[in-house]
């Protein structure tokens, strides 16, 4: 069992966009998330036979009874317009990058775009099995790019040069990567006990900067409980005032379940996102079309308000079909 906050109640449908530099493994993460949710995609197993993603991919799935829409955005700058449409429609973005700073040259541009959209986002450091230097150096490089403070949720565990697991900073539990996207609990290696304590203290300080009650506890040298930290993490991540950082290897199925559980706990729901974007309440349906394909016969849209049912008429000239982004699917012919 992967360390996580207390079981969350079933939420309404939510949506996330996966963005990242070309070659970061973003599409592999998309497929790993879908597979972990029981909705595997058909794609050549041999990476050499896979084609480069050149357009938006949309997947629907459920994880622990919560419904999700996941958008896989092309990483090449030539197709950045696909990403821009997605960012206007989702609840949160996941920035996928590699642990080597030199391989993340476009990450600053992505983070800048997210700042302009005022979109909550977290970072998934992919290909953690290729980590060559210090993970602290990776975090420092990412922090230099980010306007918002990073909140490192995990630390890698190494055996020699290999990354074999991770420590969940808040729960203080360690896990070894296993088969089928699993992770088995282990004791925290003795040489990582001090770094784990330092990481926890650093995380608490980041959160205390956002909450006076938590700051007062730290000043009085009272350690906050895990429940308090999880609650503050959820509040700050959903509001976009911090950027959580997780790690794993999508190609190896490592860190996928931990990412799913963080998404389930910390991604804001549709109502929060609508309020954040100034969408007023009401019964009249409000739909944002952010992508049209098949010569206008099919569109991707985000339902911000109300409900659209099959057979609902649309304004003259509107696309003939709408594919679900959140809340409820609609197809009008």
Model-predicted segments: where are they?
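Structural and coupling elements of P-loop NTPases
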Residues: 1-333
């Amino acid at each position: 069992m992967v360390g996580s906050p207390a079981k969350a109640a079933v939420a309404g449908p939510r949506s996330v966009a996966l963005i990242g530099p070309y070659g970061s493994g973003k599409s592999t993460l998309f497929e790993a998330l879908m597979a972990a949710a029981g909705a595997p995609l058909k794609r050549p197993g041999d990476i050499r036979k896979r084609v480069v993603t050149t357009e938006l991919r949309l997947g629907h799935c459920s994880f622990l009874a919560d419904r999700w829409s996941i958008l896989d955005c092309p990483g090449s700058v030539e197709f950045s317009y696909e990403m821009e449409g997605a960012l206007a429609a989702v609840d949160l973005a996941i920035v996928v990058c590699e642990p080597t700073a030199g391989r993340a040259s476009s990450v600053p541009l992505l983070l800048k775009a997210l700042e302009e959209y005022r979109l909550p986002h977290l970072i998934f450091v992919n290909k953690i099995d290729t980590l060559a230097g210090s993970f602290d150096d990776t975090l420092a490089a990412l922090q230099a790019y980010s306007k918002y403070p990073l909140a490192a949720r995990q630390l890698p565990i190494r055996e020699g040069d290999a990354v074999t697991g991770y420590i969940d900073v808040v729960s203080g539990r360690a896990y070894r990567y296993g088969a089928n996207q699993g992770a088995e609990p282990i004791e925290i290696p003795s040489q990582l006990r001090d770094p784990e304590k330092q990481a926890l203290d650093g995380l608490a300080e980041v959160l205390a900067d956002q909450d006076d009650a938590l700051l007062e506890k730290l000043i009085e040298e009272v350690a906050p409980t895990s429940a308090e930290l999880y609650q503050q993490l959820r509040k700050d991540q959903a509001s976009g005032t911090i950027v959580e950082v997780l790690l794993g290897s999508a190609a190896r199925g490592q860190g996928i379940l931990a990412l799913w559980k963080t998404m389930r706990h910390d991604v804001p729901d549709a109502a929060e996102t609508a309020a954040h974007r100034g969408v007023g309440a009401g019964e009249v349906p409000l739909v944002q079309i952010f992508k049209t394909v098949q010569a206008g016969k099919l569109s991707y849209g985000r339902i911000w308000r109300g409900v659209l049912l099959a057979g609902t008429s649309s304004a003259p000239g509107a696309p003939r079909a709408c594919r679900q982004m959140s809340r409820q699917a609609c197809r009008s012919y």
